[in-house]
Amino acid sequence: MDDIFDQLRSGVWLDGFDPAFGEVLAECAEKCFYLNATPPSKKAEREAIIRGLFGHIGSKFVVHSPFRCDFGFNIHIGDNFIGNFNLAILDEAEVKIGDNVFIGPNTTLCTIIHATDATRRNAGIMQAKPISIGDNVWIASNVVVLPGVCIGEGVVVGAGSVVTKDVAPHTIVAGNPAKVIRKI
C-alpha cells in the first residue's frame, strides 16, 4: 500500500479508483466526522483527534469545524496555526504549512489534478503535486490554492483569490488568478 502513496507523492499519474485510496479516504472521513462532531469545549479531545489525523502539527493551534481532508498524513503544520471553518485540504500530495499561519473560512488547498481528457478522467486517472506555505502567512477567506503552488514567507492572500502560481515572499496577492498587488 505504501508503494502507491509514494508514487502519488512523486507526481506520477495513477488510478484514483485503486482500492488502497478508498480505504484511506474512508478512514480519514471517519476521523474528520469525529472531529467535526466534537464540541469546541472538548479541547483535549479535539487536539487528540487532530494529532492523530495530521502527519504533524505544532503547538498552539485551532482548527474550527467543519474541517475536511482526504488522507491527513500528508499534512504538516508548524506552530501557532489557525484554520477557520470550512477549511478543506485535499492532501493527496504533501501540504507543508509553516509557523504563524492563519487561514480564513471557506478555503481549499488542493493537491489533486484530474486528467483533462474525459476518457482518462472518467477512468480515475489523477496526479498530485505538493503545496507549501511559508511562515507568517495570512490567507483570507474563500481562497483556493491549486496543486504545486509554493506561497513564500510573509505573504497575504486576499479574499476570494485563486492561487495558480508560486507567490514570492513578502507580497500581497489577490484576484482570480491571484496577482501581485504590492510588496510588503
Q: Where do the PLM segments sit?
A:
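Terminal amphipathic alpha-helical/low-complexity segments used for targeting or macromolecular assembly
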Residues: 1-60, 178-181
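Beta-rich strand-turn-strand
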Residues: 141-166
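Short, conserved catalytic or interaction motifs in soluble domains
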Residues: 169
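Conserved hydrophobic/aromatic beta-strand scaffold that supports enzyme active sites
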Residues: 162-164, 172, 180
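Short secondary-structure boundary/capping segments
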Residues: 5-6, 53, 123, 130, ...
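Short-chain dehydrogenase/reductase
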Residues: 156, 172-174
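Flexible, glycine/small-residue-enriched loop-and-beta-strand segment within the central core
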Residues: 40, 67-77, 82-150, 176-178, ...
